[in-house]
């Protein structure tokens, strides 16, 4: 087995071991009623969900941008050894990857500005509006984070191909750049959907 297969096997075994231990503990101490999704959703604070949305928006976007820059940058450096002329104009691909992280920062700021304090502590007093706001912020953060993650990988792979194609044939650069622009639009779609998800959100007393 390779190291990666051992890692996946270890994660799989650890996950199911934790599930078995939790199940046994809930059975022994008669806490099976707590193994309930509705109980979990109503007993957690809407602030937790909104902050999770903020964290996912920025962290997944940064991972996508870093991954794309890594893929593109390694190809630019490698191709630049044989064709030094590609180093400057292929930095456009790096800028496209960096824009993915900027999308995440913008959405994280938008979500954080919507989170308002409220005084209630009981689930009934918190109200449906605050729960809806927390879940919507979480969903928006997850939407923009995942879309930017895959957008960064997409732009990185296309940018890598653009750099290597440009090193071989300079006339191919503009054609592949158009493909890269369409790939970068994926992240923008995620931002638009996330803004729509949080457009009617109101949190507070």
Swiss-Prot record:
GO terms for biological process: proton transmembrane transport. InterPro entries: ATPase_proteolipid_c-like_dom (IPR002379), ATPase_proteolipid_csu (IPR000245), F/V-ATP_Csub_sf (IPR035921). GO terms for cellular component: clathrin-coated vesicle membrane; endosome; membrane; proton-transporting V-type ATPase complex; proton-transporting V-type ATPase, V0 domain; vacuolar proton-transporting V-type ATPase complex; vacuolar proton-transporting V-type ATPase, V0 domain. It is a multi-pass membrane protein. Ubiquitous. Residues 25-51, 112-137, 197-205 are cytoplasmic. GO terms for molecular function: P-type proton-exporting transporter activity; proton-transporting ATPase activity, rotational mechanism. The chain crosses the membrane at residues 4-24, 52-72, 91-111, 138-158, 176-196. This is V-type proton ATPase 21 kDa proteolipid subunit c''.
